[in-house]
Regions:
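Structural signal for short hydrophobic segments within the conserved structured cores
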Residues: 51-53, 105, 159
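C-terminal beta-strand of the catalytic ATP-binding
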Residues: 85, 174-177
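Conserved SAM/SAH cofactor-binding pocket of Class I
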Residues: 1-93
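Class I S-adenosylmethionine-dependent transferase superfamily signal
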Residues: 16, 98, 120-124
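Conserved Class I SAM-dependent methyltransferase catalytic core
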Residues: 111-174
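Mobile active-site "lid"/loop adjacent to the S-adenosyl-L-methionine
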Residues: 85-115
C-alpha cells in the first residue's frame, strides 16, 4: 500500500501503481486542477489501482478504508512526496519556464522552503506501517535540514539520493519500529 502526497499530475503515483499492479496507491493534492489532471492521466494509462483525492496532505484519507484487506488499518508501506520546497523570496528569481508556468501553490514552500515539509515529516509516522519508508523530494541545499527532520520524527536508515546533476534531491528513511 503506497501514498503519494502533493501528487501533481500523478506521475509518481501512476508509476507506483504500474509497478505494483496487485497493490493499491492513494494520491493527494491540494489543487483541484492537479487532482483532475492526475485522475485523467491515471484513466488514460489504465492505473485502476489508484485513488486520487483532493485536500491537504493526509486529510483526504480521513474516511478512506484499506482497499485490499477488509477492516485493516490504513497504514502505508511507502509514502512519497514532492511538496513545494522553494523559499517564497526565491520564486521571483526562478527561470521563467518554471516561474511562469508552474502554479505558485506547487512551488512556494514558505519563508525557508520547508514549511510544508516540517508538517509532512512530523505527521508521516502516524500513517506508515512499522518499517514503512518515507521518501521526499527536496530543494538544492535542503537535504541536511530535512534529514534532521526525519531523525527527529523517528526515522532510521536515512539516506540522501542525488539527481543527475549530483544535487541531493531526495531524502528517504525507514520508520523505526
Amino acid at each position: 500500500l503506497a501514498l503519494d502526497l502533493c501528487a501533481g499530475t500523478g506521475c509518481v503515483a501512476i508509476s507506483l501503481a504500474a509497478a505494483r499492479p496487485t497493490g493499491f496507491v492513494f494520491a493527494t493534492d491540494l489543487s483541484r486542477d492537479a487532482v483532475t489532471l492526475a485522475r485523467e492521466n491515471a484513466a488514460r494509462l489504465g492505473a485502476y489501482n489508484l485513488s486520487v483525492r483532493e485536500g491537504d496532505l493526509f486529510a483526504p484519507l480521513a474516511d478512506a478504508r484499506h482497499p485490499l484487506e477488509l477492516g485493516a488499518p490504513l497504514r502505508f508501506d511507502l509514502i512519497t512526496a514532492n511538496p513545494p520546497y522553494i523559499a517564497t523570496g526565491e520564486i521571483a528569481g526562478l527561470m521563467s519556464d518554471v516561474r511562469d508556468f508552474e502554479p505558485r501553490l506547487a512551488l512556494d514552500g514558505g519563508a525557508d522552503g520547508l514549511e510544508l515539509m516540517r508538517r509532512l515529516v512530523a505527521e508521516a509516522p502516524k500513517h506508515l506501517a512499522p518499517g514503512g519508508v518515507l521518501a521526499v523530494e527536496v530543494g538544492a541545499g535542503e537535504a541536511p535540514d530535512v534529514r534532521a527532520l526525519f531523525a527527529d520524527a523517528g526515522f532510521g536508515d536515512i539516506e540522501l539520493h542525488r539527481d543527475y546533476a549530483r544535487i541531493e534531491r531526495v531524502v528517504s528513511g525507514v520508520l523505526s519500529t
